[in-house]
């Protein structure tokens, strides 16, 4: 699927040194991340709300924050892909590094918040009800996230993007 998406949407894929190819690859990875994370958010939010599961709803919010990280990366690629101008004679490539820093900070903050929430649940546990629908949504989520991780890492490695590799 990864190779199919790259071949379908990226022209001249072999020339990753070309700024246009590099930018197109980064944009594709970010858009795929946004779409997958928004779909995961919707599925988990609906199931979490239907079954009253705080953990699934919290995971849905986590997917929404992942989508926002992808949006930050997309903006970084867009700004970083701008050509050199009078005020920036060496181009705008540093924006991609700033986007990578922003994504790293977001991941750190989300990790801390989820850690606090998990600790609160350990201290004050609530009963959990089993649901096949919840289980199916969570298994599908794991599979989608594994694929996304491989896809984004492959694109990041292909174009030597610290931002994508950090995502």
Describe each region flagged by the PLM.
Residues 1-167:
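Alpha-helical transmembrane cores and adjacent cytosolic helix/loop segments
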């Amino acid at each position: 699927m990864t190779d199919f998406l790259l071949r379908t949407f990226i022209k001249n894929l072999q020339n990753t040194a070309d700024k246009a190819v590099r930018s197109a690859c980064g944009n594709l990875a970010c858009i795929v991340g946004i779409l997958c994370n928004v779909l995961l958010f919707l599925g988990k939010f609906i199931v979490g709300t239907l079954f009253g599961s705080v953990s699934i709803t919290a995971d849905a919010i986590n997917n929404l924050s992942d989508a926002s990280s992808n949006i930050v990366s997309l903006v970084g690629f867009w700004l970083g892909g701008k050509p050199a101008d009078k005020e920036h004679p060496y181009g705008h490539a540093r924006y991609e590094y700033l986007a990578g820093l922003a994504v790293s900070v977001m991941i750190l903050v989300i990790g801390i918040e989820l850690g606090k929430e998990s600790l609160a649940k350990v201290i004050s546990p609530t009963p959990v009800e089993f649901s096949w629908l919840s289980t199916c949504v969570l298994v599908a989520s794991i599979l989608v996230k594994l694929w996304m991780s491989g896809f984004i890492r492959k694109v990041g490695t292909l174009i030597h993007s610290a931002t994508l590799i950090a995502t």
